[in-house]
């Protein structure tokens, strides 16, 4: 989920400007169990952003069960060597929620250099070393080395970043792949374009793979999210110092989110394409996450080699569905005898 402050309405209060919708979205992602919460912007040890989108009180009261890794490319969010209470320490020490680890800064840092070390850390912490997810401590070491060997001096912020948490801990990354084989009977990546139209029904088939082979022993549950085409989002230019409105691309519409079973490494699901699509020719996106019944195997994958645009010709059906009601059993007849607590 990409959340850009200025894309949402700013509210002026007696204590300063606020983005209530942004605060709600971030807390929602935290509660839902995001794998990583990554923030880039202004901050201090007691709040994130000038607009107090999240405060140290929020990190103290989070009650989420699935703990994310928090990353803050921001000034002074976790100066743990001071006597002040900090967001980083509070998130890590929250016994009811917060974060599994916190990677952030202890001193002032500069935005231009932040993006390089932030991207490097993300790349490594989401990668594998010797077939296993890279530990957070190793990801930090590799990220700090990366900014040294780029051919430019991008090391200015390097010593300000620290990891609060167990350096031997790694994220619970999926180790198997999910592949979408066909949509509406057409092979993905084939010669014929796959087009999903508003009002149509899509039938998707796929597999869980290991080293180019179907993982036939995988049985469990998969969750699929289908997103609409990318669209240009223009921010509101609510910051007085901005010369122009910031623009970025995002997939803002979720067309389907649902789960189904995986049997012998194979799955299929069906969904109706809603009518409120973007109606701009472009590729859609399917994300799939699967977990085995015993929760020991994880798989994920994505597919964007299909298009979403246009409308399906839908037959005008003005006749409502038939509904049949009965008590206890479908063979019930009107006026029949039932017990004192019949099942309706």
Regions found by a protein language model. Name each.
Residues 1-259, 263-272, 280-282, 288-313, ...:
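Cysteine-dependent hydrolase recognition
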Residues 314-344:
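N-terminal non-catalytic regions of secreted/periplasmic and cell-surface proteins
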């Amino acid at each position: 989920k990409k959340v850009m402050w200025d894309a949402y309405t700013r509210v002026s209060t007696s204590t300063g400007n606020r983005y209530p919708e942004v605060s709600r979205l971030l807390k929602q992602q935290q509660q839902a169990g995001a794998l990583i919460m990554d923030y880039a912007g202004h901050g201090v040890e007691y709040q994130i952003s000038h607009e107090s989108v999240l405060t140290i009180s929020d990190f103290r009261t989070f009650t989420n069960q699935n703990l994310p890794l928090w990353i803050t490319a921001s000034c002074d969010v976790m100066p743990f060597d001071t006597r002040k209470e900090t967001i980083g320490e509070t998130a890590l020490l929250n016994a009811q929620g917060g974060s599994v680890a916190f990677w952030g800064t202890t001193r002032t840092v500069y935005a231009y250099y932040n993006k390089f070390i932030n991207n490097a850390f993300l790349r490594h912490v989401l990668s594998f070393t010797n077939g296993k997810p890279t530990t957070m401590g190793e990801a930090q070491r590799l990220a700090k080395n990366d900014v040294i060997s780029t051919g430019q001096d991008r090391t200015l912020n390097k010593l300000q970043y620290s990891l609060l948490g167990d350096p031997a801990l790694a994220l619970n990354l999926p180790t198997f792949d999910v592949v979408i084989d066909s949509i509406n009977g057409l092979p993905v990546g084939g010669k014929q374009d796959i087009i999903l139209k508003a009002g149509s029904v899509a039938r998707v088939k796929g597999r869980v793979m290991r080293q180019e082979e179907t993982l036939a022993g995988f049985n469990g549950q998969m969750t699929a999210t289908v997103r609409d085409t990318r669209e240009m989002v223009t921010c509101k230019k609510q910051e007085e110092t901005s010369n122009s409105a910031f623009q970025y691309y995002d997939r803002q519409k979720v067309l389907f989110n649902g789960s189904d079973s995986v049997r012998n490494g194979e799955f299929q699901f069906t969904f109706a394409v809603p009518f409120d699509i973007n109606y701009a020719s472009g590729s859609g996106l399917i994300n799939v996450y699967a977990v085995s019944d015993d929760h020991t195997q994880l798989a994920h994958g994505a597919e964007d080699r299909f298009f979403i645009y246009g409308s399906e010709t839908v037959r005008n059906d003005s006749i409502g569905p038939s509904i049949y009601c009965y008590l206890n059993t479908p063979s019930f007849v009107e006026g029949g005898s039932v017990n004192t607590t019949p099942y309706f």
